[in-house]
Amino acid sequence: MSTNLLNITDLAIELPAGSDRQYAVREVNLKLAPKETLCVVGESGSGKSLTARAIMGLLPAPHVKVTEGCINFNGEDLTKVSYEHLRQIRGSEISMIFQEPMTALNPVMSIGNQIDEVFRFHIDMQGKERTQKAMKLLEDVHLPDPINIMNAYPHELSGGQRQRAMIAMALALQPQILIADEPTTALDVTTQAQILKLIRDLQVEKNTGVLFITHDFGVVAEIADRVAVMQDGCIVESGDVDQVLNNPTHPYTQALIAAVPRLQPRASRISSEKTVLTVKDVSKTFGGGRGLFGFGKSAREVKAVKNVTLSLHRGETLGIVGESGSGKSTLARCIIRLMDTDSGDIAINGENVNQLGRADMRPWRSKIQMVFQDPFASLNPRIRIGDIIAQGPVTQGVKKQEADQRARELLDVVGLDELAFDRFPHEFSGGQRQRIGIARSLALKPEILIADEPVSALDVSIQAQILELLEQIRGQMDLSMIFITHDLRVAAQVCDRLAVMRFGEVVETGVTSEIFADPQHDYTKELLAAVPGQGWSQGLTAN
């Protein structure tokens, strides 16, 4: 008799008619034992999340459905049990942590009521006992001040706190299997490290089998016992974590691992002594005013940027790293004059542009451009790609025909077909849209490029392509670049120098290789220590 908690055999999930392919998942075979962590890894569209949702019976029926295979749990095929029985299994026997807790948690119910609902649905328990158990769960996941958390609503918690609350709900009834679908993807590196440790500790304590879905090989190296690699709905390779990470046999696995940025910084380039950008004592504060028409309580004042001083030399890439809320993106928007500063100077080629009005600033716009984190949100969905790229030069007085020709040339530079010129943003993948965003930023022939988390939402292979493209463009066009990221692996491969930000302040600056080798500030040390899979980056896995 099998000792596995879960056995998936020849699973196939069919897509509705008219889709780009017939099957989302084909011939998938997986097994999960008690106390084991199985990581299912792959890029977007590989079928990872649909496989997990099939286990839970959460496929978007009737359009997407299991057509072949079985999902065996405790002797039952979950593809054949009734809906009512499956509801009993969810939460009590198999639980799931979703990628985005803000959309998975009920926004109009307090955290305490949502945990209480789990108990009320599955077991007969008095209200006082339910409250005590909910409090204990919040303590187990290391949430501060459980009483206030119980009464708080999801929007009142940070991302890490919301994820901890969801873990508490998932573990409320001590399930045999915990499915974690990209639970740390949207979290900062220190919060990610805490959540990974929490899941591991609770797993050992409660003998839980964990099915962990991710695209991050650093996370895989940190927590996995076994790994299954998915591509186009199929498992192309599986085995022990050491075997798959250190001796992959399938070309797709090899390509994915080769695309993962290493934590060892590359050698810094010798940049020009000429300073193209100087930021001196820049500050920016939000809030502090009253509500509509001056009534109501004063809004909380947030000092997003505090007395920041930086410089950027010609031809170099300066990385600005830090966690959410550190002020990185606010500083970038101040530098490019998308928002006004409270104080300080911003000089481009020695000219202070911080106090210039809109009309006086226009000639300087061509010298400094920005690549945004979410290209889909920053591209007008109603305008063709060629017009999006040509729009900047046209507003600067360039003739439309000349601007269109420049747009076609830039599409070639960023590796897109000339047919893209007449298409719309929704017709492209995420990586292609980011290439379009880069082309648009280059249309005005800038001297300085600010890239704000340009690869954070991309799969690892696409991420590697975009980073390579940015490096090629920087060299060909003699650009100076500010690269904003929270991913220290990316920073190690891209940046010549680093500025580390925390709570709006720059706490450490220096050459990238020197900061990685000998960080001086405690916060920098904390960030570096929290990067997952550091043992693997030296050729060994954590396990």
Feature map (PLM): residue ranges:
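ABC ATPase NBD coupling module
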Residues: K65, L78-S95, N113, F121, ...
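Conserved ABC transporter NBD signature motif
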Residues: V66-D77, G344-N352, R406
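Conserved ABC ATPase "signature" region
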Residues: D77, E129-N148, N352, Q401-L419, ...
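Conserved ABC ATPase signature
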Residues: A152-L157, Q161, F424-F428, Q432
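A short, proline-enriched helix->beta-strand linker immediately N-terminal to the Walker B motif
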Residues: A172-Q176, A443-E447, Q463
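A short, surface-exposed alpha-helical micro-motif characterized by mixed small hydrophobic
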Residues: V220-E222, A491-Q493
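ABC ATPase "signature
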Residues: I235-G239, N247, V506-G510, D518
